[in-house]
């Protein structure tokens, strides 16, 4: 279901998977004749449960809902989303829609299925979702067919229906054999199931590798294990397996022409999908997120008239009307909700020279006054009336089941906005290891090993600098060439921030300033310097593992106050609460000293694409570099 499994359950599944994969390897050894170098090397290859790769055929059979409507189902997997057809008006929609999904090494395995009630003119509304780990289907019995999953209300985790799916995962041996059959069929002109030398030569040419094309005779002899002058399916499979591991011979897909990476199994699976998309009722693809896939035709028309586009990365102009981030847990793309009127006003102010002139002519004061008035309004008893509409707008992004108190506990909107979570809702990674830093907030995160990387990939303000960020009252020399992590909190996020490291709070430094938005539209603008001009508080934390860490809490539009629950001299453990932001979006920036932290590779890779990563408090951020004085030379 994707709602968290126990360690025992995960280990049990992983143990079963290892056994099954060992069986795959045994079958490979038994099915390939001879003891020559090619087959011998092929049998030595290993596939582990951690880097399993294959093809999953996922079929959305139907659902049982609690009321009648016309229903639409979307499958989000990694950076792709697919949608079914819209059903008839019924409580029991039937789709029978299928899609082959690529299970890559170290890639996503969690698929999210979202069910929407459709609306002809307005946007479609999500009613329920379920999550399933496709690796679970690797260990199921071959006769397993349809499985039922509870559909959960995204706002409360209540069960709102049932989803019926089937899934089969093609094992590596089967993928290898089927791939060889499809490859062979391209040039098997006489359709005898074997390749002559001339047919084999044409195949090498189709692979787009000049070196391999010049070694056709040598490769043909290596493939023809029994010396009968032709290459069979098994012999071709063995050759492709070994050569892709030793010296790749496939540079481009012979079907679509796309250049392929060196990973042999992923390249093979890519080509298999190109050969055979399946014969059933196929889901429609080409979407990044389930929200994009679920839009009705009128909404699509409005998107077209505004010339806005969907894409990941650093977007400006009309492309900035959608913010797409990647969920670290599920490895799928998620669209961040933001009102279109707000988008247009932010673009006008922050991404134009006219907006810059407005800033110089009093707009800063207007934003300041607006934020103060809004802060007072959100502290009034009347503001509690806004909570239900706020929850409805962010229906699939706020889970009230995690909140410590029920909804009627909150007497003002700000009380709800700074809500606490239940104990254990945010587990802290490696709690007993102080050399592991963790995420400071539920946020959209950008991480850079150096400040230069941050200005190249993300921060476009012309005057951004560490000295400007930390101000004159903080000794910034140690941080100048350090690592930078940006935690951007959207309005729907849990707005309490926590310590990313264990240490002692040395001091607090308040820096007055403006209240620009911290939305990427402003951060990516070359016309203003959000982080160095906004109101902020700098906390210096002294640690044994990371040296000094500068924790910068930055206010933003509508954020009238930054509150702290700790004092100078307090010792904090990583994951301990430091404070909270009142209503609005806001940001925390952590600056580490140079060479003090090795940030996790997935966070750096996403940030290099200008793609924010959706994380929660306590997720691992990175580990400290070993200090030279602590190293012991072995004799």
Swiss-Prot record:
Heterodimer of a large membrane-associated beta subunit and a small pyruvoyl-containing alpha subunit. It comes from Arabidopsis thaliana. The record marks 585-586 as: Cleavage (non-hydrolytic). Ca(2+) 2 binds at residues 224, 226, 228, 235. The modification Pyruvic acid (Ser) is found at residue 586. This is Phosphatidylserine decarboxylase proenzyme 3. Ca(2+) 1 binds at residues 188, 190, 192, 194, 199. It catalyses: a 1,2-diacyl-sn-glycero-3-phospho-L-serine + H(+) = a 1,2-diacyl-sn-glycero-3-phosphoethanolamine + CO2.
């Amino acid at each position: 279901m994707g709602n968290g499994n126990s360690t025992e359950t995960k280990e049990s599944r992983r143990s079963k998977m290892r056994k099954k994969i060992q069986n795959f390897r045994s079958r490979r050894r038994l099915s390939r004749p001879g003891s020559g170098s090619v087959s011998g090397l092929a049998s030595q290859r290993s596939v582990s449960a951690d880097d399993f790769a294959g093809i999953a055929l996922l079929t959305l059979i139907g659902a049982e809902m609690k009321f009648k409507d016309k229903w639409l189902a979307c499958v989000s997997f990694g950076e792709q989303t697919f949608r079914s057809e819209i059903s008839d008006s019924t409580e029991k929609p039937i789709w029978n829609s299928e899609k082959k999904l690529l299970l890559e090494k170290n890639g996503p395995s969690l698929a999210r299925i979202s069910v929407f009630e459709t609306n002809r003119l307005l946007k479609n509304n999500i009613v329920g979702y379920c999550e399933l780990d496709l690796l679970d289907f690797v260990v199921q019995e071959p006769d397993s067919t349809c499985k039922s999953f509870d559909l959960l209300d995204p706002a409360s985790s209540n069960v709102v229906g049932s989803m019926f799916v089937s899934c089969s995962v093609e094992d590596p041996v089967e993928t290898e054999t089927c791939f060889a059959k499809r490859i062979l069929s391209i040039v098997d002109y006489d359709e005898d199931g074997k390749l002559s030398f001339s047919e084999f030569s044409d195949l090498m040419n189709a692979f787009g590798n000049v070196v391999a094309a010049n070694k056709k005779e040598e490769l043909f002899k290596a493939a023809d294990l029994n010396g009968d002058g032709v290459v069979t399916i098994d012999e071709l499979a063995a050759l492709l397996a070994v050569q892709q591991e030793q010296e790749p011979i496939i540079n481009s897909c012979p079907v679509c022409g796309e250049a392929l990476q060196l990973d042999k199994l992923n390249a093979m699976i890519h080509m298999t999908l190109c050969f055979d998309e399946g014969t059933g009722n196929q889901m429609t693809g080409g979407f990044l997120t389930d929200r994009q896939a679920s839009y009705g035709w009128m909404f699509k028309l409005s998107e077209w008239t505004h010339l806005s586009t969907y894409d990941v990365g650093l977007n400006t102009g009309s492309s900035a009307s959608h913010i797409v981030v990647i969920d670290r847990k599920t490895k799928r793309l998620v669209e961040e909700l933001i009102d279109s009127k707000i988008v247009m006003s932010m673009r006008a102010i922050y991404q134009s020279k006219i907006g810059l002139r407005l800033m110089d002519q009093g707009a800063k004061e207007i934003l300041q006054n607006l934020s103060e008035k809004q802060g007072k309004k959100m502290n009034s008893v009347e503001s509690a009336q806004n909570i239900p509409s706020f929850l409805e707008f962010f229906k699939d992004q706020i889970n009230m089941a995690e909140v410590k108190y029920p909804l009627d506990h909150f007497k003002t909107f700000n009380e709800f906005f700074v809500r606490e979570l239940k104990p254990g809702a945010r587990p802290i990674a490696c709690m007993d290891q102080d050399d592991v830093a963790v995420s400071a907030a539920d946020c959209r995160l950008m991480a850079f090993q150096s400040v230069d990387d941050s200005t190249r990939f993300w921060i476009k303000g012309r005057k951004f600098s560490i000295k400007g960020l930390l101000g004159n009252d903080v000794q910034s020399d140690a941080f100048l060439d350090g690592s930078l992590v940006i935690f951007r909190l959207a309005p729907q996020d849990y707005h309490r921030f926590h310590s990313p490291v264990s240490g002692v709070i040395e001091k607090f430094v308040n820096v007055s300033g403006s209240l620009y938005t911290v939305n990427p539209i402003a951060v990516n603008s070359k016309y203003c310097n959000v982080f160095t001009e906004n109101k902020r508080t700098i906390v210096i934390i002294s640690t044994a593992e990371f040296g000094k860490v500068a924790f910068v809490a930055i206010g933003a539009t509508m954020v009238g106050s930054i509150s702290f629950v700790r004092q100078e001299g307090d010792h904090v453990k990583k994951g301990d609460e430091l404070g909270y932001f009142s209503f609005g979006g806001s940001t925390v920036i952590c600056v580490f000293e140079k060479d003090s932290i090795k940030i996790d590779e997935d966070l750096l890779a996403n940030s290099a694409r200008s793609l924010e990563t959706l994380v929660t408090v306590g997720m691992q951020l990175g580990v400290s570099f070993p200090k030279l004085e602590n190293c012991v030379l072995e004799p």
